A protein has these predicted regions:
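Catalytic-domain carbohydrate-binding cleft regions of carbohydrate-active enzymes
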Residues: 1-267, 274, 417-581
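Catalytic and substrate-binding regions of extracellular carbohydrate-active enzymes
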Residues: 198, 206-209, 216-460, 569-573
Length: 581
């Protein structure tokens, strides 16, 4: 989300405070392993003093103190981390916080359960006064000892953030609406103090929420059909049940049995189409946001969402890679895979050496997935039956034909028209037939004196169930790569200033900034916010920082996540990038 949407989110609790005579100074985030430090200014300015982060029981916990002062510039909040949804917290002033959580999507405790809880706590703390309270009550006690807390200035990030790229269309529309919103507000076309604005923003908030569909292990149920051919047949058959857990995953089925019967009743059955309806339900938040707008703005939004395959004039001249190509007032050179390697301005004589637009298609097998699962996860012995379907791909390792591969394209047509360069690409046939690589890609480059604009299109992509990723590399080849900064919520963050066991590999950004006394470069990715600094690192979860001399790898699509996310993608797509000098 952007800063205005986050501020709107925080304003909801402020309005409720006014309505109910409450004063919110505490916040709680449960399940997701972390957030960006870019949130700190917004939270602090909204009056939030204390943030509790309760991490999913099998996810890696960032290596930060249990309680600390998170400082971003002049703004700060107290953050408390727990290795589960909530743990016991004892302050030096004699205050103890005990959480009593229900399970996900479960009802609140019964009166009897609360009576039992108070009895248990009375035995545990025989000399204490025990009362039900709010996080605000605890935050006031934290305020008393705030000055004793360690200070953290590092980014933490979110080690689940790869899920952002599971539905490129939805995220593209979301990002374009955020950009349009700013233009509409500036022009007076969209009034902040209007009912339509509230409905618009509320639906955008629902897109940003971390659950994006039905649970794979409860509603798709299929951990058998990883092979492309069998997946296509199973999807067409459109029936799943507990037998799709397969013989090799019976331990998972046993662990999940109680929950499965709770959700399905006696007969555990589902279907691919039922699972897919939940992803359309999530996309509908985009449609509802648009429907809330005045008619004129609705039309603008629909035009912004629309795109078509690039059309080149018949008279446009043809060229090849590795030769000088005149494009308007520029001379450019392409590499063997269609990437832009050099741009010379014929008027100023300035030459830019870079690597822009190298697209790569990556597939993964059970070896890579299992290694990531065991490296990233914790307490797996206790939580294996739900954590492996969430973070792994159960049964994939039995399919030896599904392997790790990195495919690169070949230019099949290079054409020019005025200041525009068209590059049409194809990947090796295996990437599309055995896996899910789009059969056709096009890159359109627009050249200006101080900017290069790049559009990437793909079409004819097959859906597959096995893990895949589509990357594009942008590398302006700067002299001092440590000067790059990530823009998150209007806060600039160094890619190498991320805490141990935070997300050092993937970031969701609004833009990238390179700033020195000699040069400024801004990279803006309108549609694809997920970026891996220095290397392609979807299934790499170690704590090394990658080499920024290699540039940035934008992750256009992946299906690593299990749980509540789309598991395949087959639609045509378009992505816009701008590199400003």
């Amino acid at each position: 989300m952007d800063r205005r949407l986050l501020d709107y989110d925080l304003s909801i609790s402020q309005k409720m405070d006014q309505q109910f005579g409450f004063h919110t100074i505490a916040a709680k985030m449960t399940d997701v392993p972390g957030h960006t430090i870019g949130m700190v200014p917004a939270l602090a300015q909204a009056g939030i003093e204390y943030l509790h982060l309760g991490v999913n029981a099998s996810s890696r916990v960032p290596d930060v103190p249990p309680m600390f002062l998170w400082k971003c510039g002049s703004e700060e909040i107290v953050v408390q981390y727990a290795g589960d949804y909530g743990e016991v917290s004892a302050l030096s002033n004699g205050t103890v916080l005990e959480f009593y959580h229900a399970h996900d999507n479960a009802a609140p405790p019964t009166p009897q359960e609360l009576d039992d809880l108070f009895e248990t706590l009375a035995a545990r703390y025989p000399n204490a006064h025990i009362e039900a309270g709010t996080l605000e009550d605890f935050a006031l006690k934290v305020r008393e000892i705030k000055h004793t807390l360690p200070v953290i200035t590092e980014e933490i990030g979110d080690t689940w953030i790869h899920g952002v790229a599971t539905d490129p269309w939805k995220v593209s529309c979301f990002r374009r609406l955020l950009q349009l919103k700013e233009a509409w507000i500036a022009s007076g076309q969209l009034l902040v103090a209007s009912p339509s604005y509230d409905v618009f923003m509320e639906n955008l908030l629902l897109v940003a929420e971390h659950t994006w569909g039905m649970d794979v292990k409860k509603y798709l149920l299929d951990f058998t059909n990883w092979n492309k051919k069998s997946f296509i047949a199973a999807r067409a058959n459109d029936h799943t049940d507990e037998t799709f857990y397969d013989a090799c995953n019976q331990a998972l089925l046993t662990g999940m049995s109680e929950e499965l019967h709770h959700y399905h009743g006696e007969h555990i059955t589902s279907s691919y189409s039922k699972f897919e309806t939940s992803h359309q339900e999530q996309r509908n938040y985009i449609l509802r946001a648009v429907e809330a707008l005045p008619e004129e703005l609705q039309e603008q939004a629909k035009k912004e969402f629309a795109f078509s395959w690039p059309s080149v004039p018949e008279c446009a001249p043809s060229f090849h890679a590795n030769e000088p190509i005149p494009v308007g007032s520029f001379i450019v050179t392409l590499g063997a895979h269609g990437e832009l390697l050099q741009v010379k301005n014929n008027v100023s004589g300035e030459i830019k050496d870079l690597s822009l637009g190298l697209i790569e298609y990556e597939t993964f097998g059970g070896k890579e997935v299992d290694a990531c699962y065991y490296d990233y996860g914790r307490d797996l012995k206790d939580n294996y039956y739900w954590s492996e379907p969430d973070f792994g791909k159960p049964g994939l390792h039995y399919h030896k034909e599904i392997r790790h591969n990195i495919y690169t394209p070949t230019p099949v047509s290079v054409r020019t028209d005025n200041n525009t360069l068209y590059v049409f690409l194809q990947f090796p046939q295996e990437a599309s037939e055995a896996y899910g690589c789009p059969r056709e890609f096009a890159i359109v480059y627009f050249f200006e004196n101080h900017a290069i604009c790049m559009q990437i299109f793909w079409k004819n992509k097959d859906a597959i169930r096995s893990p895949e990723a589509i990357w594009v590399n942008i590398n302006p080849q700067v002299i001092e790569p440590t000067c790059w900064k990530l823009n998150k919520l209007n806060t600039y963050i160094s890619p190498d200033h991320v805490c141990y066991d935070g997300n050092r590999k993937l970031h969701c950004v609004q833009k990238l900034l390179y700033h020195t006394n000699q040069k400024n470069i801004v990279i803006t990715s309108l549609d694809a916010p997920l970026v891996s600094p220095g290397a392609k690192t979807l299934y790499t979860t170690d704590n090394t920082f990658e080499d920024l001399n290699n540039g940035f790898f934008f992750l256009l699509y992946n299906n690593r996540w299990g749980t509540n996310f789309k598991q395949w993608y087959e639609e045509d797509m378009r992505f816009d990038f701008t590199i400003q000098y």
